[in-house]
UniProtKB/Swiss-Prot annotation:
Catalyzes the attachment of glycine to tRNA(Gly). Transmembrane segments: none annotated. The gene is glyQS. This is Glycine--tRNA ligase. Signal peptide: none annotated.
Length: 463
């Protein structure tokens, strides 16, 4: 069955993964809050990314840079001049669109659009192809104008151009401007990488497709610094690592993932090569994870703007270079959405029954194990077992407790939210010290002594 966006959105809202932000005030467009389950799942994703790409690598460091940076950072990086979208308005109903996206939806292979495409060319296509407004079907468009995507605000009490600052549209620049600090304080030698997870903000003209494109989001970015002659080998290494992570760590079906090499004439101004790893979302194939060779564009640009030399000094060979950079870049909300789409299933059972199942790998499950008393009179004893297990809980191992409703309905709820196992505390538990463990995907059950429960947890709930 083909998964519809409305279906997955309703599921996530109903179970408390995602809420409409400011809902009691009728919400705020394109703004979402992550409920208790969504917050846990997002944290699991981030921990898994750090474990795989940072903490298990001998040449990686972690950074947490400021959201608000000196505006000259954005002047040097090109964001003030180039980080914009072509905005066009419908003259009839005043609806606003990205002109390039309207044209892309024509699916006309003869039309090539890049970030450097002249606005007059886009205007002519809108006229020649009689592109209609999605809301009122008018073909009467305004002139295209460039709309900068950075959120602008002011620092201090005076709102003038001297106090203008911006919320960062990416985390990468915080890494580049700290290159010298990291080399000096951490005594780094090329090649090495720096990773960062943090908030970024983009004032998108047409956000949408649920959490796929939002104005506030989290990024996981790595800037890997290296000599030019090592670029190809490391670029290929990251291709393999990203695919391995998606398929073998997140257990995403490889049929839902494909590579897309960006054509030379479509590359961003800073990139000499970019591969997008695309996922088949409900709205179609779209970018999930980007991998770019940025050359030495950023370090050179910041050297020129700041007057500080951001080079690397090889003390053994007595040489200086401005290293090249390879950048894997991922939106946390985007990979979260892909995980939901990949692992959500509606399973048909006997007697015309069905169940919703979120078949998450155990490392991603919001709760690895739920403790459920069979009947209410066993609630106190089951809750004490739950409290005992909480003593061994940590960032990667979480337990939950639920005593409300029939055991069957509780099983269904935990299947739906992705809990890998349910532990049932029944009369055998009380009289013989034996509990029943039910596995989510197969629904098979085993019985184990409570005395062996911690060993079972070590064997089955840690990856």
């Amino acid at each position: 069955m083909e998964l519809k966006q409305d279906q997955i959105v309703n599921f996530l809202k109903n179970y408390g993964f995602v809420y409409q932000s400011s809902e009691i005030y009728n919400g705020l467009a394109n703004s979402w809050d992550y409920g208790p389950l969504g917050a846990l799942l997002k944290n699991n994703i981030k921990q898994l990314l750090l474990k795989h790409f940072v903490f298990s690598q001998p040449d990686m460091k972690l950074l947490d840079s400021s959201i608000i940076l000196n505006p000259l950072v954005w002047q040097a990086s090109g964001h003030l001049d180039n980080f914009s979208d072509p905005l066009v308005d419908c003259k009839k109903c005043k609806s606003r669109y990205r002109a390039d996206k309207l044209i892309e939806e024509l699916n006309d292979d003869s039309i090539k659009i890049t970030e450097n495409t002249d606005p007059s060319y886009l205007e002519q296509i809108l006229v020649d192809k009689k592109v209609e407004c999605k809301k009122c079907e008018s073909t009467n468009w305004t002139k295209i104008r460039k709309f900068n995507l950075m959120f602008k605000t002011f620092q201090g009490v005076v709102e003038d151009s001297l106090n203008t600052i911006y919320l960062r549209p990416e985390t990468a620049q915080g890494i580049f401007i700290n290159f010298k600090n990291i080399v000096r304080t951490q005594r780094m030698k090329l090649p090495f990488g720096v990773a960062q997870i943090g908030k970024a903000f983009r004032n998108e003209i047409t956000p949408g497709n649920f959490i796929f494109r939002t104005r506030e989001f989290e990024q996981f970015e790595i800037e890997y610094f290296l000599e030019p002659e090592l670029v190809k080998e490391k670029f290929d290494w990251y291709i393999n690592q990203i695919e391995d992570f998606l398929i073998n760590k997140l257990l995403i079906n490889k049929q839902l993932i494909k590579r897309h090499e960006i054509a030379k004439d479509e590359l961003a101004h800073y990139s000499s090569r970019t591969i997008d790893f695309q996922f088949n979302f409900p709205h179609g194939w779209s970018e999930l994870w980007g991998l770019a060779h940025r050359g030495n564009f950023d370090l050179t640009a910041h050297s020129n703007e700041s007057g500080k030399t951001l080079d690397y000094h090889n003390e053994i060979e007595k040489t200086k270079i401005i290293p090249d950079v390879i950048e894997p870049s991922l939106g946390i909300e985007r990979i979260l959405y892909a995980i939901f789409c990949a692992h959500y299933h509606v399973e048909q059972l006997a007697d015309n029954d069905s169940r919703e199942v979120l078949r998450l790998p155990v490392s991603l499950s919001p709760y690895q194990l739920a403790i459920l008393p069979l009947v209410n009179k066993l609630k106190d004893q089951a809750y004490q077992l739950y409290l005992d297990l909480l003593k061994i809980s940590d960032a990667n191992l979480r337990f939950d407790f639920d005593s409300a409703g029939s055991i069957g309905k509780r099983y269904r709820r935990y299947d739906a939210i992705g809990a890998k196992y349910c532990l049932t505390y029944d009369f055998d538990s009380l009289e013989k010290g034996i509990v029943t463990i039910r596995e989510r995907d197969s629904m098979e059950q085993i019985k184990i002594p409570i005395s062996e429960l911690r060993q079972w947890i070590r064997n089955n709930l840690h990856e």
